[in-house]
Amino acid sequence: MHRRNFLSLIAGFAVSPAAIAKSNARKQCLLLIELQGGNDGLNTVIPFADKAYSTLRPTLAIKNDKLWKLDEKTALHPSLHKLNDCWQADQLAIVQGLGYENPNRSHFRSHDIWTSASEFDQRKDSGWLADTLPEENSTVQAVIYGNRSSVLQGGELNYISMHRTREFLSAKLPKLQALESNANNSQRHVHSVLKNTLAYQQRLRAVAKSLEAKGPDDGGEFGNNLFAKQLQDAALLISSGLAPSVITLHLKGFDTHANQIERQGKLLENLSTALAAFRAQLIQNGHWDDTLVVTWSEFGRRAGENASGGTDHGTAAPQFVLGGRVKGGLHGQQPSLSELQNDDLVHTVDFRQLYASLAEQWWTLADSSINKKRYPALDLVKSA
């Protein structure tokens, strides 16, 4: 086999030999969902009582009679209505106004800042999770659905990546098995990587059997789209006792420069439908208290709409935190619509405060890469 073919097969594996012996003991799992492209926070968590909202957005403002109102001032986009049970159970936290000083409107640079937890004028080669999570030779610490996640780059974390669990088990592993059987002594490193990778497959057999029992791969109650199916796979992974410390997913399409009403509405509907099914399944299987779901996006959108029925790259935006141990409700302060800076919202909560909360309250880490004096944790998670 050509070297490039081999590399394409093993891409995404970094599993230590000791990972194979890890038991199926339950553990806490953080599920990170990237709303890729920059979600418009102002039409997600809506300050409908502020008259400036409809003034800034004469055609994009969600009509009052369609809003899912949380209180007398704040509402959610109607497409998020399937999260109502989670909200009513006080298991949905909405962190308002997340951003950082001297915001950058470039997708690439702002993405780097969010994934590395760096300052606006600082360059880092490692992701904030790679810097935060302690190394464990005895476990697979992360599962990545889709492209490699920058929050995990650098360091020595053990991870495995896949597009879909079913596809991974049916297509990629047979090729790896054939390659492993043909490896010779001169390919000792290759043989070692393959052996460890294939051994991890044994722990996925329960997942494979469950997938086969489900029949057609249509996503079911999660929804018939790639994100929904990947979230369904993640739920099955957690329910099967294979939860790593971190699972990452991406929901693409939030760069809504035009036709935003329809595009964002569909994306938020896909998000809420899949998350509602995910929560229901984990509650049924007794793993909801062990799971924390957090959304993030590289930036929000401009306060005002553009001439194309959309919004351009902006700054601050809200994010969601869901789980059985979450302290639900509104956290932080909605950015002012009357005190804009260069036509942008001014952030009220630094996004690294969210990361500090995860390190302190979810993983109970006394030390992490986050400067907790500058970025104090929010009160988001109940103790176990």
Over which residues does each language-model region extend?
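Feature for exported/extracytoplasmic and membrane-associated proteins, marking the mature portion
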Residues: 2-285, 304, 318-384
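A post-motif C-terminal structural segment
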Residues: 300-304, 309-318
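Acidic/histidine-rich, metal-coordinating catalytic segments
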Residues: 292-299
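Conserved H-loop
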Residues: 288
